[in-house]
């Protein structure tokens, strides 16, 4: 759908104006109108209206001639919208009444019969579900591409040694591939959450009408089948009043953004001169207006920043719903802008992130040097002593003393002589030096989920299988 046409603040009679003695104030019109943002639902609104009209015809509620006129008119309106020729009127409040008014102008009384057995309450709930279902499918597709980019980079670095961190302090050696696959696992759970949320999105509210259902002999299952819904909402009050499906999606989106924010923080650190682990492609960075040497990682910084935006939308939607009595309330008009912006932010972030990962260059030497300088094999020395029969807590104390001595000497554990090491424990023998290598440390974690290169390759196979 193209961007909305100009909003024309022209007078027009409202569908509900018969009850009132005076027109709505102009400022109130502007305050209450939603067409400035819900126009995005137009194509889905038309899809729902077409299915509703066909059902009304099949049930004998309106004539087949009316159905044919409605189909013709809505088809023409769809073309107008796609071509940017549709005039959205602020005076008509929202996407639904704008389309209905245009339809009635085109086909007369047949257009007035379209809303039979329907309310804007179940209409908008249907529109949002149709739209969000499509957006979830788009997000899943982009998420899979991002996961594929992670796997491709991890495959290149299944053996690349880097320091693993806790508290941002060097902890133990891992491989860069293993580190990247941690994010693959997070995103895999995110994908599962989206798939699961889609099941609850994919329920048809139409037929609930305003709140109590309708007295017309409608066939909700027929409409659900035509629109691709798995089932109908079972309670009319619930169908029109709750937006938990939108909140659930936004929560899933917030988790995706949070995971990408964590990775972004690491990319920012790793690309800094203090680390020098990676180089982010120039097309994802910007310079400084005053400092000629600067190369700023703007994309990961913005991902980190936009995560707060999406998290804020989640809180906004939760707060929106928390005090509403059943059934529909005008408060729910405020669900769309946070939801729309969440989708927009998520989709572009997923797309740009996949491309950014493909452009990363890795400095293997810098990674290895950082792992070698941080006593990353200290735990391996403790495990070595445990395998010699020493209780782990005693081994922990022995190695801590050895590390302190190495710090005082300005060297690593592997640089200490055998006699120096044996001062801390006579159990230490010549074979300890094989344990204190980075490769030895990695190879010893040779179990499912471990960081041994062989296990990383097995994990990569499983990841590829998940992606298909």
Curated annotation (Swiss-Prot):
Signal peptide coordinates: none
UniProt keyword Amino-acid biosynthesis present: yes
Catalytic activity line of the entry: 2-(N(omega)-L-arginino)succinate = fumarate + L-arginine
CDD domains, per database record: Argininosuccinate_lyase (cd01359)
GO cellular component: cytosol
UniProt main location, coarse: cytoplasm
InterPro entries assigned to the protein according to its UniProt record, in alphabetical order: Arg_succ_lyase_C (IPR029419), Argininosuccinate_lyase (IPR009049), Fumarase/histidase_N (IPR024083), Fumarate_lyase_CS (IPR020557), Fumarate_lyase_fam (IPR000362), Fumarate_lyase_N (IPR022761), L-Aspartase-like (IPR008948)
Pathway(s) per entry: Amino-acid biosynthesis; L-arginine biosynthesis; L-arginine from L-ornithine and carbamoyl phosphate: step 3/3
Protein localization: Cytoplasm
Record-linked PROSITE patterns: FUMARATE_LYASES
Alphabetized Gene3D superfamilies for the sequence: Fumarase/aspartase (C-terminal domain), Fumarase/aspartase (Central domain), Fumarase/aspartase (N-terminal domain)
A single BP term in Gene Ontology: L-arginine biosynthetic process
Keywords: Amino-acid biosynthesis, Arginine biosynthesis, Cytoplasm, Lyase
Annotated EC: 4.3.2.1
GO molecular function: argininosuccinate lyase activity
First-level EC class: lyase
HAMAP family xref list: Arg_succ_lyase
Family: Belongs to the lyase 1 family. Argininosuccinate lyase subfamily.
PANTHER family in UniProt: ARGININOSUCCINATE LYASE
The name this protein goes by in its record: Argininosuccinate lyase
Organism: Methylobacillus flagellatus (strain ATCC 51484 / DSM 6875 / VKM B-1610 / KT)
